[in-house]
Swiss-Prot record:
Keyword Transmembrane helix: no
Keyword set, alphabetical order: ATP-binding, Isoprene biosynthesis, Kinase, Nucleotide-binding, Transferase
UniProt GO BP: isopentenyl diphosphate biosynthetic process, methylerythritol 4-phosphate pathway; terpenoid biosynthetic process
UniProt name for this protein: 4-diphosphocytidyl-2-C-methyl-D-erythritol kinase
Enzyme Commission code(s) on record: 2.7.1.148
PANTHER family noted in UniProt: 4-DIPHOSPHOCYTIDYL-2-C-METHYL-D-ERYTHRITOL KINASE, CHLOROPLASTIC (PTHR43527:SF2)
Pathway named in the protein's UniProt entry: Isoprenoid biosynthesis; isopentenyl diphosphate biosynthesis via DXP pathway; isopentenyl diphosphate from 1-deoxy-D-xylulose 5-phosphate: step 3/6
UniProt xrefs under NCBIfam families: ispE (TIGR00154)
Primary role: Catalyzes the phosphorylation of the position 2 hydroxy group of 4-diphosphocytidyl-2C-methyl-D-erythritol.
Originating organism: Synechococcus sp. (strain CC9902)
Keyword Kinase: yes
Length: 307
């Protein structure tokens, strides 16, 4: 049996630049892996069947699941149609949370099955396959701190931080946000201000590459945590409003923001002790508001084989 960990991500920067010719939004982002992670277990089978079970009954384990899509794609590319696997997913990342849980699980399937089946694909080849399945999936393969451009699939690594930065995540377990809805609503509300053309897009990419807070990520020059979807989603999602308000009452965070398309929100701290203390201090108010919380350190890697 093989086990792969699949970490969540937060967006330290999410800038919606404009619309591409293919209808997708052109993005300029900084994504960061954190140590809240799912676990995907693999067992070889001799029946050419690919199956998935999960400890969370609310998650579909049918053909729409990215784990199965990734497994089918990898087997098809290998040409070895006799390969089979039984997979078991332990969910720890909340579903529909803006934390790339599904994408990370799909990336874990690519990495794990590449090893289990002895296919020998490089990380770059796996990232390329991941991009066919989801915009966040290449990042989940690579992990750490990455500049993410295009739809999010074009990666440029950022120097790893030597500091023990941490995040306090909060989410209402009863609320999820549709990513397509969030981007459509963003276009409706902000489309008239979108940039147009590759020259304008590249200037914003260059500005982000040269941002002083990425040289490297550190507490002394914290990221401003821009998220262009935050104002759009928060306006229509009370759970996001409440989460941000509670996090903003804390005395020591470096910055506060929503992650991805939400509804998860987080506060960034200079070290894990401050983060843990904030989680303890805020716990009664979070419980009263029906919010769950996770105090997480930052990771320098993406999905990884654990055993």
């Amino acid at each position: 049996m093989l086990t792969v960990t699949a970490p969540a991500k937060v967006n330290l920067h999410l800038e919606v630049l404009g619309l591409r010719s293919d209808g997708f939004h052109e993005l300029a982002m900084v994504m960061q892996s954190i140590d809240l992670a799912d676990s995907l277990q693999f067992t070889n089978t001799a029946d050419a069947q690919i199956t998935l079970r999960c400890d969370d009954s609310s998650l579909s384990t049918g053909a729409d699941n990215l784990v199965l899509k990734a497994a089918e794609l990898l087997r098809a590319r290998s040409g070895f149609n006799e390969l089979g696997v039984s997979m078991y997913l332990e969910k720890r990342i909340p579903i529909g949370a803006g934390l790339a849980g599904g994408s990370s699980d799909g990336a874990a399937a690519l990495v794990g099955l590449n090893a289990l089946w002895g296919l020998g694909y490089t990380a770059e080849a796996l990232e390329s396959m991941a991009a066919e399945l989801g915009s966040d999936m290449p990042f989940c393969v690579a992990g750490g701190t990455q500049l993410c451009f295009g739809r999010g699939e074009l990666l440029e690594p950022v120097p790893p931080t030597a500091e023990g930065l941490a995040v306090l995540l909060v989410k209402d377990p009863l609320v999820s946000v549709s990513t397509p809805w969030a981007y459509q609503r963003c276009k409706e509300l902000k489309g008239k201000n979108y940039l147009e053309g590759e020259v304008a897009f590249e200037q914003r990419r260059r500005d982000l590459r040269e941002a002083p807070w990425l040289q490297p990520l550190r507490a002394g020059c914290p990221p401003p945590l821009r998220n262009d979807l935050q104002v759009v989603v928060a306006a229509e999602t009370q759970a996001v409003q409440v989460s941000l308000q509670l996090l903003q009452t804390l005395p020591t965070p470096l910055a506060v923001a929503m992650s991805g398309s939400g509804p998860s929100c987080f506060a960034l701290f200079g070290d894990q002790d401050q983060c843990d203390q904030a989680a303890a201090d805020l716990s009664p108010k979070l419980k009263a508001a029906g919010l769950k919380a996770w105090a997480c350190s930052l990771r320098s890697d993406g999905v990884r084989i654990a055993s």
